[in-house]
Regions:
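Preference for extracellular/luminal or secreted protein segments
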Residues: 1-218, 222
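Short, conserved catalytic-motif segment at the N-terminal edge
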Residues: 219-277
Length: 277
């Protein structure tokens, strides 16, 4: 075949000079930016905590990593809402962690921005896992998926996780707009990240979406705890313990959790509705 393809003849050498200019055209850069935006993945969004409501003074952004590494994201967040910004380096001492945690206690929503790190210390994991605030926690990762793996104990207690895969300026600005449903996100994971995020995981964010009406943290409860009810209810369905059920959790006279599962009976295919008792 090498004779048929002409490979026996000496091929002209590739011209290396000026190659970067021939490759990095405006069209190529626009395509790369489009692909980056398409890959943004919302891994979970319990009780529709996203999109955030742009209420002045309600939102804190905690940046963890090298200082200014997520400056485009922080600036874009400031344009969307009156946020208050905090910063911590990786492996910060305990006194600094505790000081920041005390300051975060005053906010209704907390966004934790993670920028690249080759090493996540046990101290970082312990702090984030033990971060006990009244606000739901929204994580944004401007890193590869690998950074999520050591932080799984903390992410299991989050309300939303957004994976951007990288940290280009335009991408950071885009993710900030996704958090307020000004831009869409429809990415899906092609592979599993631990047991928490199986392959295919991804939540849709569409422009114009409204924030969830009831977020458990606003009533002194935890979204990740109530969300686990879903798995318990579905496990009972799979085991044949019941054909269907409705789970209602009230707090301060309001339904914080209200979901139906399955059907009325084994012979009745009517799905359980909000009006069923």
């Amino acid at each position: 075949y090498k004779y048929m393809l002409g490979l026996r003849n000496r091929q002209p050498q590739l011209r290396v000079s000026g190659m970067s200019y021939r490759i990095n055209t405006e069209e190529a850069q626009a395509l790369a930016a489009k692909l980056r935006r398409s890959a943004v993945t919302v891994l979970n969004n319990y009780f529709d905590v996203l999109p955030l409501a742009p209420v002045e003074g309600d939102i804190a952004v905690l940046s963890i990593g090298e200082k200014e590494a997520d400056a485009p994201f922080v600036e874009a967040m400031k344009k969307n809402a009156g946020i208050v910004h905090f910063h911590l380096p990786w492996n910060a001492d305990e006194a600094l962690w505790q000081e920041v945690q005390g300051q975060l206690a005053a906010f209704r929503r907390v966004v934790i921005s993670i920028t690249g790190s080759a090493y996540v210390s046990d101290r970082d994991v312990a702090f984030l896992e033990g971060l006990n605030l009244r606000a739901p926690l929204v994580y944004t990762f401007f890193t590869s998926y690998r950074t999520l793996q050591p932080l799984m104990p903390a992410l299991a207690k989050s309300s939303a996780v957004v994976l951007a895969h990288s940290a280009e300026t335009d991408l950071q600005q885009y993710v900030a707009d996704v958090l307020f449903a000004k831009k869409p996100a429809s990415g899906r994971m092609s592979m599993s990240i631990g047991k928490l995020f199986p392959a295919g995981t991804g939540c849709m964010i569409e422009p114009g979406m409204k924030p969830g009406k009831t977020v458990p943290e606003d009533y002194g409860m935890k979204s990740y705890v109530l969300q686990s009810i879903d798995a318990v209810a579905r496990k009972g369905l799979e085991a044949g313990a019941y054909p269907g059920c409705r789970v209602l959790v009230w707090k301060d006279g309001l339904p914080v959790y209200d979901k139906g599962f399955g059907t009325h009976s084994d012979k009745d295919t009517t799905t359980v509705r909000s009006s069923d008792l």
